[in-house]
C-alpha cells in the first residue's frame, strides 16, 4: 500500500476500495468523490484494523448520515445489553455507532463492538482514561492520555472524538463569559477539570502532533469535539463556542497537512433562528470540513421528547450544511436509553436526515418518496409497508384498526379521496353504500 490514509490516497490520485464502495452507494463518480476527500470536504472514516467495516462517506453532496450512541456506565454495566443495542443499530442501518463507555475496563466491549459492526465506529478516549489506569483524573499524565487514544486506534476505532479545541485560550474565554449551563460536554468538562487541577495546557492540544501520528498510522479520522457546545438555548452562539470553533479551524488545517481526515462536532442546544447561521459559521471557520451535530435541540422544555426537539433541529441543520447527525432518544437528559428508546431515536434522526436530503437535492433522495406516492395512489398497502421507515409500526397500526373496505383505512372509509379519484378517473361507480368493495 503506497498511501497512509484515505486523504493521502486521494491527494495522490489513488482510488481506494473504500472510495469505490462509497461512490457506488452515493451514485456518484468515484473521481469526483476522490477530489472531495483530497480537499477534506468528505471524510471516509476507515481504520485499517476495522476489518468488518462497510465504509460510508460523510460530507459535501452526500446523503446525511446518522450516528447512534451507546456504551457502558457505572449504573448500567451490562455488556450483553449494549451488544443488543449494537445489533439493533446495525439492523436499523445506522451508518455510525459511538461507544461512549465511561466506567471500568472497556476494551473487551469495544473490541467486540468493532469486530461485529459494519458501521463506522467512533470512541471518546478520555472517557476511558480513569478506568484504563485506575487513577484519579488529575493524576493521569499527558502521555498517558495519548496512550489511551492510541489503544482505541489500535483496537480499530474509525474516528476518535477528542476535544482539542478546549485549550488555555478557550478556557480563558469561558471564564470571562459566564454561562447558564457551564460546560455540558462530558469530555470537555473532564479536560477542563484536568487543566484546572494541574494548571497545564490541554494534553491533546499540546501533543497534537503526536495525536496526528496516531491517526495517520491507523488511518483514524479525527472528530474534533466541541467542549463548549451550548447546553441550553441561552448559551448558544456565545464567545466560548466561537472561540473554540476558531481553534478547531486552525487544527483542521494542521491535520489536513498530515493527511488526517477531520470531522467537526457542533451544537448542541439553540433556537431555530440560529441554526442556519451556525452551520455557515462552521463551514467558513473550518474550511468546509464535514459537520457533525448533536441535534441541535431547539427547546429545553421537553424531557422525554428530545428525539423530536432534536429531529426538528437536525433537519434544519442538515438542510443548511450539517453532514452527520448524532441521534437523540426520548431518554436524553433522563437516563441511559433502552432498546425502545434507541428505535425511536434512530427513526427520528433518519427522518430528519432524509428530509434534509430532499431539501438539499441529494441525488436519488426523492426516489423513495416518489415510490411511496405511487404505492399510495395505487392503494398498494403491502408496498406502502415495505417503503415505510418503520415497517413494523405501519403494519401494526393498520392491523389494529381494520377497515371494512380493503382499499381504504378507518380514517375515511369509502370517502377516501385516493380511492374515489381512482374510481372516477377509471370510469367506475363509487359504491359508497355497499361493503362488498
Curated annotation (Swiss-Prot):
Annotated binding of Zn(2+), by residue: 269, 333
| GO function terms (MF aspect) | 4 iron, 4 sulfur cluster binding; carbon-carbon lyase activity; zinc ion binding
InterPro entries, per the entry? ThiC, ThiC/Bza_core_dom, ThiC/BzaA/B
GO CC aspect terms: cytosol
Q: Which UniProt keywords apply?
A: 4Fe-4S, Iron, Iron-sulfur, Lyase, Metal-binding, S-adenosyl-L-methionine, Thiamine biosynthesis, Zinc
**Keyword DNA-binding attached:** no
Under which EC number(s) is this enzyme classified? 4.1.99.17
Pathway involvement of the protein, from the record: Cofactor biosynthesis; thiamine diphosphate biosynthesis
Pfam families xrefs: ThiC_Rad_SAM
Q: Where does [4Fe-4S] cluster bind?
A: 409, 412, 416
The cofactor required is: [4Fe-4S] cluster
How many cofactor units bind, and how? Binds 1 [4Fe-4S] cluster per subunit. The cluster is coordinated with 3 cysteines and an exchangeable S-adenosyl-L-methionine.
Q: Explain the purpose of this protein.
A: Catalyzes the synthesis of the hydroxymethylpyrimidine phosphate (HMP-P) moiety of thiamine from aminoimidazole ribotide (AIR) in a radical S-adenosyl-L-methionine (SAM)-dependent reaction.
Q: Which family does it belong to?
A: Belongs to the ThiC family.
Q: What is this protein called?
A: Phosphomethylpyrimidine synthase
Q: Source species, please? A: Clostridium botulinum (strain Hall / ATCC 3502 / NCTC 13319 / Type A)
The encoding gene is thiC
